[in-house]
Amino acid sequence: MDLDILKQTAARRAVELVEDGMVVGLGTGSTAAFAVSVLAERVRLGLRVVGIPTSERTARQAEAEGIVLGTLAEQSRVDLTIDGADEVALGELALIKGLGGALLREKIVAAASERLIIIVDATKLVEQLGSHGPLPVEVAPFGWQATARALERLGAEVNLRAQHGQAFLTDGGHYILDCRFGPIARPAELEAAIDRIPGVVESGLFVGMASAVIVADEGGIEVLTPSAAP
């Protein structure tokens, strides 16, 4: 089955959780974009929500599709955030996010949310994080080389993310270092070690944050929770 169809299926299930009057965090990335479109369909049918976008790209899409947007300064709580993930570890449902370049804002909104609902296709499920790709780490541009060397001392192969021949810039004006650690046995410990490095703004490790993961594959939909995941 086409991956886009799977993403749409997961997005529709997640958006079913949105109720009238909710403040909803809007994730970033190809899967989250489907959720924004599905939510916009419900808004056009009369659903009233306020969206909190996690990137300028998501804000543009949501505005174009007619979703009213707000900010964390205006809203004291976020009822539900719907977002994608690059990898989901079975069991505790720890996540790697940030290949779309919005990990800092995604983590801020997720942390402010009552519930974080992750939508993925089954290819994103792994036994251990780091099995498929790099861990993005957002860093200050000043002295990023020193930050990269500190990450290398933790065991990573580090590459500065580039776009159009220049360093990729996040919405906050930061760089992203893509760090290949290999399989990550203890993500919470690694997250803490990375966060202690001067120059690190945020890592793409989301540990203990997902309320549920909605997984779509050719057999249908499965909803994983940290307590019920295999």
Swiss-Prot record:
Keywords from the UniProt entry: Isomerase
GO BP annotation list: pentose-phosphate shunt, non-oxidative branch
Recorded GO MF terms: ribose-5-phosphate isomerase activity
InterPro entries: NagB/RpiA_transferase-like, Ribose-5P_isomerase, Ribose5P_isomerase_typA_subgr, Ribose5P_isomerase_type_A
Pathway per the UniProt entry: Carbohydrate degradation; pentose phosphate pathway; D-ribose 5-phosphate from D-ribulose 5-phosphate (non-oxidative stage): step 1/1
EC number: 5.3.1.6
Catalytic reaction(s) noted: aldehydo-D-ribose 5-phosphate = D-ribulose 5-phosphate
Coiled coil residues, start to end: none
Listed NCBIfam families: PRK00702.1, rpiA
HAMAP family listed in its UniProt record: Rib_5P_isom_A
Descriptive protein name: Ribose-5-phosphate isomerase A
Species the sequence originates in: Gloeobacter violaceus (strain ATCC 29082 / PCC 7421)
